[in-house]
Amino acid sequence: MEQNDNGLFIKQERFEVLAILREICKQRTPLKVVNDRQQFQSLLLSVGPDNIVFSGDEADNRVDGECTIVIESHDAKIEFSVGQAEFTDHQGVNACSTRLPKELIYIQRRRQFRVTTPHWREFLCSGEYADGSEYQLRIHDLSAGGVGLRVDGPLPENLQPGFQFKKALLDLGSYGSFKVNMELVVINEDHELDDDDNMVHFSRLSCRFMKLGLAMERKIQSAVFAFELDFNKKKKR
């Protein structure tokens, strides 16, 4: 299963699993460890290529059998299962070590689902209208479920809720290009300050993807997640 209507994704790509867990470790996000005998609060202390280490101060003397680890981060709930954990010492702290999970269940919160693209990133949506005329619109924001398109100036008369973009090409630069069908759901008036602190008004077209295959859903979600990780890293520099 790749996605359902609740924003659930199963992350099985090794680089994604490592990237998510390393970010959780870096942010020191609390986690809960649960098995048949006990449950306790913990922190990820280390994420290696093949194993993870989490604090075990609140654990019993043994952590027997398979465990489920639950992490409630600011933008998602993450769950995964690990095998037998072994007690160890990590920089003077009682800890548990186990193998890197093969997959993560990643439930993205709707309020964080959409990523706004900075103005200096030229992410574009292009294609042809039914009459053969071409269009090229800037992608204002994106998610695994759709995109927000930006229109500066008057709206073309044909762009009304219910309009369908057929075979639209989403160009996300180094994050990939995707050809999709989309439906225009709603049009909102929006504004922002430009580099000279002048107010700029524009129209935002909220579009949803139509009948994406599982493979395409996965590719778009991976691109969104990779862009969000890179953008957050740059903001922290």
Curated annotation (Swiss-Prot):
One term of GO molecular function = cyclic-di-GMP binding
Its main localization is other
Q: Which UniProt keywords apply?
A: Bacterial flagellum, c-di-GMP, Nucleotide-binding
GO process annotations (BP): bacterial-type flagellum-dependent cell motility; regulation of bacterial-type flagellum-dependent cell motility by regulation of motor speed
Q: Which organism is it from?
A: Serratia proteamaculans (strain 568)
Instruction: Note the Pfam families from the entry.
Output: PilZ, PilZN
This chain belongs to the protein called Flagellar brake protein YcgR
Query: Which top-level group of life is the source organism from?
Result: Bacteria
Report the sequence similarity comment from the record: Belongs to the YcgR family.
- Residue intervals passing through the bilayer: none
The uppermost taxa in this organism's lineage are:
Bacteria, Pseudomonadati, Pseudomonadota, Gammaproteobacteria, Enterobacterales
Output the Gene Ontology cellular-component terms. Answer: bacterial-type flagellum basal body
InterPro entries of this UniProt entry? Answer: PilZ_domain, Split_barrel_FMN-bd, T3SS_YcgR, T3SS_YcgR_PilZN
**Nucleotide-binding: present as a keyword of the record?**
yes
UniProt key word Nucleotidyltransferase: no
Assembly and interaction partners: Monomer. Interacts with the flagellar basal bodies.
Q: Where in the cell is it found?
A: Bacterial flagellum basal body
